[in-house]
């Protein structure tokens, strides 16, 4: 009985995260305040980068933090609330599933015909949910790679791969800064969840990968 209930609880966690993640900030902000659908411009992507092109950097920063925060919120909501209803001693469930589901919702939002972003900002939220130290680590690698390559997409993809190594360190998932995941399964559970998130990022960047291989991907221009 506990096994079936554990499965049901994890399915519930997934749906909670997915519905939260489907609240795509760039689409909502664009339609509410600018009467524009960000998906109709430039890359057609509903994320912070395209919002920068359409609405400017101030709005893009707000959207970026919303996309990050909603993943953290979904994970911590499950981590804080669910133990009051479902005892972790009786049932096996994983709060980080809510974070992964929120990333999927960001990429394929149910409220907006499943046309969303590429999930990069949402993956940052997933990293924070695992361990807040992973955020600055990822940031350092991303900006170093961006400065070196000038490609936002390539920097995002390489940083995604690099972070697998850091997540594989047991302390990152079970240490004092891992409140949302510590005590909910072994550290390898987080690795598996992150691998799914990484796979989604690569899938959503498949056109960028083609352009990178053909050397037609646009480079970031730095102002002096």
Swiss-Prot record:
Pathway: Lipid metabolism; phospholipid metabolism
Enzyme class: transferase
MF annotations from Gene Ontology: acyl-phosphate glycerol-3-phosphate acyltransferase activity
The entry's keywords: Cell membrane, Lipid biosynthesis, Lipid metabolism, Membrane, Phospholipid biosynthesis, Phospholipid metabolism, Transferase, Transmembrane, Transmembrane helix
Recorded catalytic activity of this chain's protein: an acyl phosphate + sn-glycerol 3-phosphate = a 1-acyl-sn-glycero-3-phosphate + phosphate
Cellular component terms (Gene Ontology): plasma membrane
Subcellular location: Cell membrane
Signal peptide: none
InterPro entries: G3P_acylTferase_PlsY (IPR003811)
GO biological process: phospholipid biosynthetic process
Membrane topology: Multi-pass membrane protein
Superkingdom: Bacteria
EC code: 2.3.1.275
The UniProt record lists the keyword Heme: no
Major location category of this protein: membrane
Record field: transmembrane: 3-23, 54-74, 90-112, 127-147, 152-172, 183-203
Function: Catalyzes the transfer of an acyl group from acyl-phosphate (acyl-PO(4)) to glycerol-3-phosphate (G3P) to form lysophosphatidic acid (LPA). This enzyme utilizes acyl-phosphate as fatty acyl donor, but not acyl-CoA or acyl-ACP.
Known partners and oligomeric status: Probably interacts with PlsX.
Similarity comment: Belongs to the PlsY family.
Protein name: Glycerol-3-phosphate acyltransferase
């Amino acid at each position: 009985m506990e096994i079936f209930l554990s499965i049901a609880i994890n399915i519930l966690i997934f749906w909670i995260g997915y519905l939260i993640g489907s609240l795509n900030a760039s689409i909502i902000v664009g339609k509410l305040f600018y009467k524009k659908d960000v998906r109709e411009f430039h890359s057609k992507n509903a994320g912070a980068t395209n919002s920068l092109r359409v609405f400017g950097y101030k709005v893009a920063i707000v959207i970026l933090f919303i996309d990050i925060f909603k993943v953290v919120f979904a994970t911590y909501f499950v981590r804080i609330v669910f133990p009051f209803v479902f005892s972790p001693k009786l049932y096996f469930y994983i709060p980080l599933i809510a974070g992964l589901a929120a990333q999927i919702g960001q990429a394929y939002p149910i409220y907006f015909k499943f046309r969303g972003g590429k999930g990069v900002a949402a993956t940052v939220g997933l990293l924070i949910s695992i361990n807040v130290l992973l955020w600055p680590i990822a940031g350092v690698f991303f900006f170093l790679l961006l400065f070196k390559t000038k490609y936002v997409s390539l920097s995002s993809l390489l940083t995604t791969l690099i972070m697998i190594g850091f997540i594989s360190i047991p302390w990152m998932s079970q240490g004092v800064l891992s409140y949302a995941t510590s005590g909910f399964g072994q550290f390898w559970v987080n690795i598996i969840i992150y691998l799914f998130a990484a796979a989604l990022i690569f899938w959503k960047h498949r056109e960028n990968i083609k352009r990178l291989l053909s050397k037609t991907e646009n480079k970031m221009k730095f102002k002096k």
